[in-house]
Amino acid sequence: MNNYNNGDYKGGREQHFGGNNNYNRGYGGNGGFGGNRYNERVELTTPDWDLESLPKFEKNFYTEHPDVAARSDKDIAAFRNEHQMSCLGSDIPHPITTFDEAGFPEYVLNEVKAQGFPSPTAIQCQGWPMALSGRDMVGIAATGSGKTLSYCLPAIVHINAQPLLSPGDGPVVLVLAPTRELAVQIQQECSKFGSSSRIRNTCVYGGAPKGQQIRDLARGVEIVIATPGRLIDMLEMGKTNLKRVTYLVLDEADRMLDMGFEPQIRKIVDQIRPDRQTLMWSATWPKEVQNLARDYLQDPIQVRIGSLELAASHTITQVVEVISEYEKRDRLVKHLETATTEKESKVLIFASTKKTCDEVTSYLRADGWPALAIHGDKQQSERDWVLREFKTGKSPIMVATDVAARGIDVKGINFVINFDMPGNIEDYVHRIGRTGRGGATGTAVSFFTDGNNKLGGDLCKIMREAKQTIPPELQRFDRKSFGAHIRYGGGRGGRGGYGRGRGGYGGRGGYGQRNYQTGSNQAPLSNRRF
């Protein structure tokens, strides 16, 4: 899949499914994306859709594999039960168990096999037949479960079945995501698996110059991955349109609503023909997401992996220390000393505010720890650089706010430290879920203070379900219910369990690109530790 941002477009895509190239029955052709001379904005209004006059399009590409068709209802129920899979809706296709059973065209299957995946994930086993069948669907699964490929590969098949883009046409596939980091990661997957089809894509998000994004849209792209706010900017400026969109994805729908994007989502979806295929993906299923699905999905089918009851992964060791605010820094350093016993470990530290994020980063660097900060006040170029340094291990400690960390998928995070507790238990589970992925083990350390008392009951419930050791201070708090006052002192509990001693990160390199660094990321790095 060609990615304009990487400058590797080599020409138009091939038609794997055929179709009529003379696509001139009402889409596109709006005289280009130039907008007016002064880039005046035009308020978006909901089109009066006449489905009879809209060009027809194909969205059902699924043919059940003979091996899948031969399985008994008992076998299917056993498979779903084994993978904690539950489905809702009518005429739900049976799950597949291998890549070959999915029914992908050979050009897609070859891309998948080239990546060396042993087998589909649970969400892919059920999600692919659903998506390929053209149905509106809801997928509920944890972050890191393989949901991106669950909609990305069917999107490639969908695009190749549609007529080629004409000048002035907008995208065929639109993916909405809550953050620029997640949008970029989705784009990377789309580029990786669509290379043989020469499908073009671009990422449209805030915090970056509009010029390159506008040029990408003007050249024509089959896939747009966007954050809601920046996409509305482009639509109101006349730089793109959604008339060709027949495959819509809402990724991390719960997070988008948490971040207040519901009005923008509704405004965008109203610009898309109502007979499109819509796929909604979410880690949770709150009423707000249900209402959005009810308004925009037609006769949807749903697959859920795991229970709707909020739970933390059992591969994560949860350590909670009940301490005071002034003890946090000393405790943080002690845990970093423990974390460095694993040579190539990565540590993700969460802070509640941008100010705290910078203060912790500056403190750690002055103490000799190779830490970098990422939050919303950083320019996109610096955020990208920090993320690269963290992923490669050149800076193995990253301090982040919740918003900056949403959508970031980094492999090999061994430790998560909640320097500040989040405001709700859902964010706690989401934070600590950055470690212990894919069956690996991980450790999550949380500093619980008097200001976090409202979380006490829910935190005990999460830890108890995961069979974790609850420190006595937290147990006392749980018995007194919400709002109880905690007297600090005595043992902290939960500190053991993953070893002690100090190792090393193998040098202090990786800080050459100083032009990216601002604020706390420019704080001098002491040689005290390494």
Curated annotation (Swiss-Prot):
SUPFAM superfamilies recorded for this chain?
P-loop containing nucleoside triphosphate hydrolases (SSF52540)
Note the SMART domains from the entry.
DEXDc (SM00487), HELICc (SM00490)
Where does the record place Polar residues bias?
514-530
Q: Which GO terms describe its biological process?
A: nuclear polyadenylation-dependent mRNA catabolic process; nuclear-transcribed mRNA catabolic process, nonsense-mediated decay; rRNA processing; termination of RNA polymerase II transcription
Q: Where does ATP bind?
A: 141-148
Please tell me which stretches of this chain the record labels as motif Q motif: 97-125
E.C. numbers: 3.6.4.13
Q: What class of enzyme is it?
A: hydrolase
Q: Which PROSITE patterns does the annotation name? A: DEAD_ATP_HELICASE (PS00039), HELICASE_ATP_BIND_1 (PS51192), HELICASE_CTER (PS51194), Q_MOTIF (PS51195)
Main subcellular location of this protein, as a coarse class: cytoplasm
Family statement: Belongs to the DEAD box helicase family. DDX5/DBP2 subfamily.
Subunit structure, interactors included: Associates with polysomes.
Annotated protein name in UniProt: ATP-dependent RNA helicase DBP2
**Phylogenetic lineage:** Eukaryota, Fungi, Dikarya, Ascomycota, Saccharomycotina
Give me the gene this protein comes from: DBP2
